[in-house]
Regions:
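Generic non-transmembrane alpha-helical segments
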Residues: 11, 15, 160, 164-174, ...
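Non-catalytic positions within long, well-ordered alpha-helices that form the structural scaffold/packing
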Residues: 99-102, 199, 218
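Active-site/ligand-binding-proximal alpha/beta "capping" segment
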Residues: 162, 168-204, 262
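Short acidic/polar active-site loop segments enriched in Thr and Asp
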Residues: 104-105, 204, 223
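Metabolite-binding pocket within alpha/beta catalytic cores that recognizes anionic/polar moieties
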Residues: 1-153
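Zn-dependent metallopeptidase/amidohydrolase metal-coordination segment
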Residues: 208-246
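His/Asp/Glu-rich mid-to-C-terminal helical/loop segments that flank catalytic regions of hydrolases
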Residues: 235-269
Length: 269
């Protein structure tokens, strides 16, 4: 595993013109942040040794390098999901490669179903913590020596970055929520009973990604900021049939606000 990570990192280092310390994983319907990137060059996942390939509509499947404002960044346009059939090692492989490339801060975004009764479709939620409801743990197996065997997760989402994001949202007049994200396997959306259970467990929003990558980032010593766009509601009395197209539409409508916060925050890190 370590050899494969290092082989992939060595290939990318040979292609890279910059040395970013900031990475972004762009989720469902939120990939248009790449339109803000200047001086960019792209590498398709299919050209990268050992890299999985995304199969989901709305996930393009390429690494993008360039500048966001004055900051050198790398962005994953298209992430890998456990429900696609990948192992947890494959889902989180890119984060380990990021560590080899010198990434220090990771920004993640996703689409999520809101279970907090105060949430509305289109809200942005800053992730303050998460619940791991996946059936497999990304650190199961032999410990890769990027971090300890038993990593601390008491601050999985960096409090300093959360505070800065709050300041930016206030300056820009953008409404943001705060909440706990629960990560599940998918690919089904939740039943009303599951929404109710997750809410009882303390979650504010639910989705099918993010948690594995955040766990591995923390293991690697990479600090994390995460944000969800609430694309559907799992609140009793407000639950309706949901399609992937509905999720993408809601995410696309909220995208300009998320882009503003992410761009400003990345440039203040």
């Amino acid at each position: 595993m370590l050899e494969r990570i290092q082989e992939t990192a060595a290939y990318l280092k040979g292609q890279m013109h910059t040395h970013p310390e900031t990475a972004i994983i762009l989720g469902t319907g939120l990939g248009s942040l790449v339109n803000e990137i200047t001086d960019k060059y792209e590498i398709s996942y299919t050209d990268i040794p050992n890299f999985p390939v995304s199969t989901v509509e709305g996930h393009s499947g390429k690494l993008i390098f360039g500048k966001l404002g004055n900051k050198d960044i790398m962005a994953m346009q298209g992430r890998f999901h456990f429900y696609e059939g990948y192992s947890m090692k494959e889902v989180t492989f890119p984060v380990r490669v990021m560590h080899e490339l010198g990434i220090k801060t990771l920004f993640v975004s996703n689409a999520a179903g809101g279970m907090n009764p105060n949430f509305e479709i289109g809200d942005l939620m800053i992730i303050t913590d998460h619940i791991n409801f996946f059936p497999e743990h990304p650190l199961r197996g032999k410990n890769i020596p990027y971090g300890p065997r038993f990593p601390d997760m008491s601050e999985a989402y960096n409090k300093e970055l959360i505070a800065k994001a709050d300041t930016i949202a206030q300056e820009k007049g953008i409404k943001v929520q705060h909440g706990i994200y629960i990560g599940t396997q998918g690919p089904t959306y939740e039943t009303p009973a599951e929404y109710k259970m997750f809410r009882i467990l303390g979650a504010d929003a639910v989705g099918m990604s993010t948690v594995p990558e955040v766990i591995v980032a923390n293991h690697c010593g990479i600090r994390v900021f995460g944000m969800s766009v609430i694309t559907d509601l799992g609140v009793e009395g407000k639950i309706v049939e949901v399609t992937h197209e509905d999720v993408q539409k809601a995410a696309d409508q909220a995208q300009p606000l998320m882009t503003t916060i992410m761009r400003e925050l990345i440039n203040r890190v």
